[in-house]
Amino acid sequence: MSHGKGTDMLPEIAAAVGFLSSLLRTRGCVSEQRLKVFSGALQEALTEHYKHHWFPEKPSKGSGYRCIRINHKMDPIISRVASQIGLSQPQLHQLLPSELTLWVDPYEVSYRIGEDGSICVLYEEAPLAASCGLLTCKNQVLLGRSSPSKNYVMAVSS
């Protein structure tokens, strides 16, 4: 069940927007005022785009839909928002990597530049279940366990 509330995904969207804005900022071709408008518009666009595709109880569900992708072709959401601040397609292609994948999922935002690049995590938060004492595989590794606890079933036969 999707929560449908924009506030549930604000940290993840803020991380994605901040990352994309920083990529535009590094070239120095976009003014801070235009970046501010871009960031606000992108935050709104992503919140609207993801609102029925956000599943905190199953973070990987809908991941492909939420993925922001530039593969020599500009992601349509980035393209639309950039046009609001007067950035053309050729300008966008000069400012952003030619290959970028940005995954915006509940509890984690990560990216990869290039097809063979390493995946880097921008934002990570423990799911609510993990913070309530339930051990996930990842949490067990962090706690130093080499494998999950084993449950044994004893059967008695006569």
Curated annotation (Swiss-Prot):
It holds the Pfam family BTG. Gene3D superfamilies: Anti-proliferative protein, N-terminal domain (3.90.640.90). Changing residue 75 to A: Abolishes interaction with CNOT7 and CNOT8. Changing residue 115 to A: Impairs interaction with CNOT7. Inhibits CNOT7 mRNA deadenylase activity. GO terms for molecular function: transcription corepressor activity. Keywords: Phosphoprotein, Transcription, Transcription regulation. The keyword Nucleotide-binding does not apply. The modification Phosphoserine is found at residues 147, 149. One of its GO terms (biological process) is negative regulation of neuroblast proliferation. One of its GO terms (cellular component) is extracellular exosome. Changing residue 148 to A: Impairs PIN1-binding. Phosphorylated at Ser-147 by MAPK1/ERK2 and MAPK3/ERK1, and at Ser-149 by MAPK14, leading to PIN1-binding and mitochondrial depolarization. Changing residue 65 to A: Abolishes interaction with CNOT7 and CNOT8. PANTHER family: B-CELL TRANSLOCATION GENE, PROTEIN BTG2. Anti-proliferative protein; the function is mediated by association with deadenylase subunits of the CCR4-NOT complex. Activates mRNA deadenylation in a CNOT6 and CNOT7-dependent manner. In vitro can inhibit deadenylase activity of CNOT7 and CNOT8. Involved in cell cycle regulation. Could be involved in the growth arrest and differentiation of the neuronal precursors. Modulates transcription regulation mediated by ESR1. Involved in mitochondrial depolarization and neurite outgrowth. Belongs to the BTG family. Interacts with PRKCABP. Interacts with CNOT7 and CNOT8; indicative for an association with the CCR4-NOT complex. Interacts with PIN1, inducing mitochondrial depolarization. This is Protein BTG2.
